[in-house]
Amino acid sequence: MEKALGNVANRLLFENERVKVWQMDLAPGQSSDFHEHKLPYVLCIAEGETVDADFENGKSIRIPVTPGTVYFVEPGSRETAVNRSNTRFLEFLIELKGG
């Protein structure tokens, strides 16, 4: 049975025909919905030390993050973001719709 998909982040801040801007705010121990990245996106890290990505195959990776860092990410991954650190994790995610 396939897992239901949720949003790529906690809160949609803005949307138009070209972009969707999301906020992902995870307190220590908190996790996101299981989600799929169907669009290319830009991540802007605002706070945190690490965030884990738990995949549907049971594997997990820990990603060290540095506030102020910006990443471009291609679409295709399906995961749950989990904050297993002792500090807040905050990022802004900009999905690029094209056009």
Give residue ranges: language-model regions.
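Catalytic phosphate/metal-binding cores of nucleic-acid and nucleotide-processing enzymes, i.e., regions
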Residues: 3
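A short glycine-rich, His/Asp/Glu-containing loop-to-beta-strand
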Residues: 6-33, 40-43, 94
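Short beta-strand His + acidic residue motifs that chelate non-heme Fe in jelly-roll/DSBH
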Residues: 32-34, 52-53, 78-85
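Short, conserved beta-strand element in jelly-roll/cupin
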Residues: 36-52
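Short acidic-glycine-tyrosine-enriched beta hairpin
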Residues: 57-75
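Ligand-binding loop in jelly-roll beta-barrel domains
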Residues: 75-99
